[in-house]
Amino acid sequence: MDKVRLGMIGIGNMGTNHAKSLIEGLVPEMELTAIADRKEARREYCREHFPAGIRIFEEGQDLIASDVCDAVLIAVPHYQHPELTMIAFDHGKHVICEKPAGVYTKQVREMNEAAARTDQVFAMMFNQRTNSVYRKMHELVTGGELGAIKRVNWIVTDWYRTQSYYDSGSWRATWDGEGGGVLLNQCPHNLDMIQWICGLPSKVQAFCHIGKWHDIEVEDDVTAYLEYPNGATGVFITTTADAPGTNRFEITLELGKLVCENGKLMLHKLSENERTFCKTAKGGFDTPECTVTEVETDGENEQHVGVLKAFASNILHGTPLIADGIEGIRGLTLSNAMHLSSWLGHPVEIPFDEDLYLEELNKRRADSRKKEDSDVVFDTAGSY
């Protein structure tokens, strides 16, 4: 085969944008051959706006069972991600899954076990891994040239959302429909970056404020404290209610500090290891010499299209993925730990008790409000 035939399951905000990219030919080695959506209004939209040859299904399982595609992209409500992924594997389909990998790690662990039993390609839509600035941060930190991490700070409050956004779907911003708020919907990208660049912390203490700024039952404002195995600490702050918001990611290491803000990466490079300087300097107020430079990157930032290109190329040629599907559990581990810590009111060790997390989640699902359905779809371009 010279092109991967893709079936899109879910034509909501993200699915629609992915479908448009494929129809416009932005992914040369992939073609959209089928879509599935339970909403008649979305299926009718596809009949009116998509090429006539694209097959239209109501159920994702029926699309998977058909012979019209080699791979599927899963862009449905979060709880269904692992379920549909495992069904696709059973039918010999390659899978690329939208974030998050699922709602709770116990569910995603089962999905990863299924992935390990198949030869099919499994990828996650972690589009921020294509960002040249984050890739350079990953290179500098994991390469070790700046020494060990001492501190991680990320204020990411530029995820502004209106009440209209939260009212746009019956499943959105509910425990039973979405499984969480800003941590599950917007921040999987950021949490993936933290674990990809800095690794997973060993302990989390979080404060997740429920419906602080919007009429929703899930969190829209979070402050979390992180502790790492080597003694490093971190703070993660996010909300969907700050305007204007901030997006500043700082990593302090033994030989300097990286600051990512406004699309630029600045390196504050020390003349020597701070730990050595602290122990050997004679003056009580001496500080290490420091030079500040903007770090050059390759400038590439293909986002979702780049992830799809890599997925197709991996299937056809065996080239590397942007993000292996089994890595989705790592960022979810962070968000689950934050939720659990906030629910229990004390720090949570990682790994945490997955059965306890599910028990606490199900308590909230049992009381989850029912919302009226809506067919509103937003253009998500530039919002991620």
What are these regions (language model features)?
Residues 71, 77-129, 144:
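Beta-strand-loop-alpha-helix segment that lines the small-molecule cofactor/substrate pocket
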Residues 1-51:
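N-terminal Rossmann-like dinucleotide-binding module
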Residues 53-60:
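Conserved SAM-binding strand-loop segment of SAM-dependent methyltransferases
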Residues 219, 224-230, 251-253:
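Active-site beta-strand termini and strand-to-loop segments that position acidic
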Residues 188, 213, 237-245:
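Glycine-rich phosphate/pyrophosphate-binding beta-alpha loops
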Residues 228, 254-326, 348, 359-384:
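C-terminal glycine/acidic-rich active-site capping loop/insertion
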Residues 16, 82, 188:
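Residues forming the Rossmann-fold NAD(P)(H) cofactor-binding site
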Residues 10, 128-215, 345:
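Predominantly a Rossmann-like dinucleotide-binding segment in NAD(P)-dependent oxidoreductases
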